[in-house]
């Protein structure tokens, strides 16, 4: 059976949004927004791994309760200057992992 992967670009700084923290780390229902998105993907039985593309200097990721999401998460700190670059970098990291 083929493996399916999710790739979540989360390297943005949210500078246009104007908040003190990147918008993926803003809280909703007591948890960062990114937690809710990742939890939904981790619950999906068809997805083998959830790759999260983060910026190299991401200071907020360590605060996310990722252990409660199980072992599917694969954070990679290779975000680019744009979302497209982050996705390309994440796909390259995933491709290298699978090679």
Task: Locate the predicted segments by residue.
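N-terminal glycine-rich phosphate-binding loop and ensuing alpha1 helix
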Residues: 3-59
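Conserved N-terminal catalytic core of the sugar/cofactor nucleotidyltransferase
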Residues: 35-99
């Amino acid at each position: 059976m083929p493996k399916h992967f999710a790739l979540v670009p989360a390297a943005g700084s949210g500078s246009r949004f104007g908040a003190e923290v990147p918008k993926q780390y803003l809280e909703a229902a007591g948890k960062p927004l990114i937690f809710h998105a990742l939890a939904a993907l981790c619950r999906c039985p068809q997805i083998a791994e959830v790759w999260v593309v983060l910026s190299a200097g991401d200071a907020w990721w360590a605060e996310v309760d990722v252990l409660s999401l199980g072992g599917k998460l694969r954070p990679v700190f290779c975000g680019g200057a744009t979302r497209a670059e982050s996705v390309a970098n994440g796909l390259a990291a995933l491709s290298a992992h699978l090679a």
